């Protein structure tokens, strides 16, 4: 990799002037190592996976060692930069911390380099996090900033790695960053120019150890001078109050109070940076439904804090297209809608997907990651016509449906073949579906027990639906 932008090495933070250990040679780790290598720094990468090791060696002229070797030589390093997915209880990270070595992540590293002026004048950082809606909101906010004339790009989990945005030959002035709880855990000094927490619900408990630790990681973005939260999320409001956070901007589906954005007379309205200023019609926002309106309000709150006009917000929303697997109607056949919301990887996201539907044939299952699905099932029992269940935690889901939605039909596939399992459930869906029903893929669980990711899961669902419809036409 070659550096593509002017750098000021004299501004390099002292902690990065010694030997640096990077843990992980995946996408993030490779990006970290590449940026540090291009700066001429002394980098060693720890990775046990042989395929990842060989791929990195082909890309970069850096030393690659196993994690046990790295543990045995921690005294050689001045700092550890970890890939965000590495858990805090990983032995090499535990040992590093016990020796007093600082452990940070890719976002923290990029933040420190940018704020130190290594890549020129510091960028504006707009950080977006929460349990659900991050990607859509980040994309909306980037679109609003661009519409307002800012040189902005969406970075982080949504697409461009933060390291790539910093080193790009086309300078970026505004980084609209979708940040995960993992990245924020490893970002102890990050203070973005604006921080947004959309909502909080149980997720990644297996990684963080508790819901509270997960939530506290998310709230790190609220150290920003402009801090925005979902005012309809009672737990988030209670937590920020407990933490003594003040001066927050809120967004709500209701009429906005002081320092809030909300909905009034069918319009998104700003009552935080103006007096009940209409921004855009609530009708026609993509994605449709309450979740889309909330995402638009959240993005608008941050955009308004940066000086984007109501006209530019309306213009951005008018042309905004949602990313895949977030509520797309795959097909409509004989009065039945087939909807792909594979991105609903936890109960909170599935709750949003189920809300407002009248009669749902629900395809659900995967890895619950420690989350409890009982409340979700009980809340929507009246609309669940059938539950079609797959995945590693299928037994737990079946128990919840039997207890809390006893009138729902249940079908379970024990197949671990990703295509066969989905086709089996789609076949059941076609047999059960009647005009007015919605066949909804909203798994409420992660996909990696059977699929390469939520995208593949959604694609296979769509393929199964469309091929079944086509097959029926040929009969």
UniProtKB/Swiss-Prot annotation:
InterPro entries: Mur-like_cat_sf, Mur_ligase_C, Mur_ligase_C_dom_sf, Mur_ligase_cen, MurD. GO terms for molecular function: ATP binding; UDP-N-acetylmuramoylalanine-D-glutamate ligase activity. One of its GO terms (cellular component) is cytoplasm. One of its GO terms (biological process) is regulation of cell shape. It is found in: Cytoplasm. Signal peptide: none annotated. It catalyses: UDP-N-acetyl-alpha-D-muramoyl-L-alanine + D-glutamate + ATP = UDP-N-acetyl-alpha-D-muramoyl-L-alanyl-D-glutamate + ADP + phosphate + H(+). It is an enzyme of class 6 (ligase). Pathway: Cell wall biogenesis; peptidoglycan biosynthesis. The keyword Ligase applies. Keywords: ATP-binding, Cell cycle, Cell division, Cell shape, Cell wall biogenesis/degradation, Cytoplasm, Ligase, Nucleotide-binding, Peptidoglycan synthesis. Its EC number is 6.3.2.9. ATP binds at residues 130-136. Cell wall formation. Catalyzes the addition of glutamate to the nucleotide precursor UDP-N-acetylmuramoyl-L-alanine (UMA). NCBIfam families: murD. Belongs to the MurCDEF family. This is UDP-N-acetylmuramoylalanine--D-glutamate ligase. It comes from Corynebacterium efficiens (strain DSM 44549 / YS-314 / AJ 12310 / JCM 11189 / NBRC 100395).
